[in-house]
């Protein structure tokens, strides 16, 4: 039984009691594995575009008249980026020396190459409050790239990108950035400082909105017996619902096309041409696919769903060829209803990069409960390694997900889809954590590009490795994509 205090706490967060009870039930039942048919590969599931096709889709994007908005998840702190340096600082404080060849030693040896170089005590300045405090800052506010007359943060590099592929005919560039509440002021101050500079440089007008993960998307933690985890003061412990919680933020944006890329996946401007080129290709592909979907739905309206066999076969072929949606045999009247339902969904085109490491999470062909197949992006934790078919599919994976998405989010009547209705709630995650030394179970919502977009028409397109340049550790800033040696 929940106490009155706990019920008030749930209501204050905007969490419906029914949602709360469903979350508790999820802990008890767990989340089922999806049925994997195969890894998506160039043979089936990933489009490899010819030079002519690439040129065509760039032209489609450049002539697109709709409203494009960049969406940048940027709420994570840079703690992991500096993990090795924190450990080294602790060892130095204990009287130990830096191990030769260690990440911290490489950091110190190359300190002059970093854009935030300062000749003072580097580790202290980089990590701790009353100095740079980089260890607890968001990645978006850390200087990544050094230029002749300026240094740039990832946030600024996204402003530059937006001007080069998301500027409309009026010169407007729209961008929504999700940030944590405690760091929003820092982003707003940086934006105010640099906005005019980049507007003049790129002849554009920025419209940047900062949003926060909504408290109603947080999920209660439970103890190891699946009872709500209670803190010492009697209140419940809620934890962030993961990046899937950002679906609510995405759903609030009024745009025709949303371009999604993580905050740390940027390059210095001299290498930006390929990134811009491929972003335009993905935008062109997504908007062309959407136009074809709209044409079929309007034709179905005109015919009042009394479709000739040839058109039914054509639509089935389109869904299978473009989105890997294979529809099983069924009576014709039921089939037309299924085809309409499958067509009338948001469209996303996702860049996929060739695997160079161990296979794991990435693009897969999934068999759904309704008997149809679809393309899905899975995390490694969603794959049942004990299932031979799933394990073999994972071993056969050729590409991974760099989080490079273009989403067309309006229907054929010009109305915004309610994206919250196109998810698979049974694709969440459960993990074990701790709070103040006590073990607990934490639950995450279906990932933003995973189960949160399960019921979308999805196409995967092979993109080059140069479009994927995340900064996971501070030493990644020494790679040629980020550093001028």
Spell out what each predicted region is.
Residues 1-41, 334-344, 348-349, 356, ...:
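Long, compositionally biased intrinsically disordered regions
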Residues 129-135, 264, 269, 279-317, ...:
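Conserved catalytic alpha/beta cores of large enzymes that bind or transform nucleotide phosphates
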Residues 7-8, 14-15, 32, 36-356, ...:
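Domain-scale recognition of functional cores that engage charged ligands
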Residues 389-393:
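Active-site rim segments in enzyme catalytic domains, especially the processed small/beta chain
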């Amino acid at each position: 039984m929940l106490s009155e205090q706990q019920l008030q706490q749930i209501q204050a967060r905007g969490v419906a009691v029914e949602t709360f009870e469903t979350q508790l039930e999820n802990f008890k039942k767990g989340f089922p594995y999806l049925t994997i048919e195969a890894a998506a590969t160039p043979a089936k599931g990933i489009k490899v575009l010819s030079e002519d096709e690439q040129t065509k889709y760039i032209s489609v994007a450049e002539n697109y008249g709709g409203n494009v908005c960049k969406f940048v998840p940027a709420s994570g702190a840079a703690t992991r980026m500096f993990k090795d340096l924190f450990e080294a600082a602790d060892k130095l404080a204990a009287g130990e020396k830096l191990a030769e060849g260690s990440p911290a030693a490489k950091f110190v040896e190359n300190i002059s190459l970093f854009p935030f170089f300062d000749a003072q005590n580097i580790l202290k300045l980089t990590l701790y409050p009353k100095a740079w405090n980089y260890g607890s800052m968001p990645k978006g506010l850390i200087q990544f790239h050094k230029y002749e007359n300026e240094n740039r943060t990832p946030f600024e590099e996204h402003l530059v990108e937006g001007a080069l592929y998301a500027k409309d005919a009026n010169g407007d560039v729209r961008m929504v950035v999700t940030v944590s509440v405690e760091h929003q002021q820092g982003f707003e101050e940086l934006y105010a400082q640099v906005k005019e500079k980049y507007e003049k440089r790129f002849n554009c007008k920025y419209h940047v909105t900062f949003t926060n993960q909504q408290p109603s998307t947080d999920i209660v933690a439970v103890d190891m017996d699946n009872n709500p985890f209670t803190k010492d003061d009697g209140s419940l412990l809620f934890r962030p619902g993961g990046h899937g919680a950002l679906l609510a933020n995405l759903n609030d944006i009024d745009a025709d096309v949303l371009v999604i890329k993580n905050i740390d996946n940027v390059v210095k401007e001299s290498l930006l041409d390929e990134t811009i080129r491929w972003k335009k290709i993905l935008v062109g592909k997504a908007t062309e696919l959407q136009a074809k979907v709209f044409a079929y739905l309007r034709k179905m309206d005109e015919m009042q769903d009394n479709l000739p066999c040839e058109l039914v076969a054509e639509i089935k072929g389109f869904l299978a060829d473009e989105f890997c949606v294979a529809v099983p045999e069924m009576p014709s009247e039921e089939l037309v209803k299924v085809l309409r339902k499958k067509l009338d969904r948001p469209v996303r085109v996702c860049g996929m990069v060739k695997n160079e490491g161990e296979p794991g999470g990435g693009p897969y062909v999934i068999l759904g409960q309704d008997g149809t197949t679809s393309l899905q992006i899975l995390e490694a934790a969603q794959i049942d390694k004990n299932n031979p078919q799933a394990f073999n599919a994972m071993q056969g994976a050729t590409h991974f997900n760099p989080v490079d998405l273009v989403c067309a989010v309006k229907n054929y009547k010009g109305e915004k889809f309610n994206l919250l209705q196109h998810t698979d709630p049974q694709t969440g995650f459960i993990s074990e954590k701790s709070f103040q030394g006590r073990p607990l179970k934490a639950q995450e919502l279906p990932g933003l590009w995973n189960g949160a977009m399960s019921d979308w028409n999805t196409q995967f397109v092979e993109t080059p490795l140069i479009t994927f340049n995340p900064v996971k550790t501070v030493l990644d800033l020494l790679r040629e994509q980020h550093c001028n040696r």
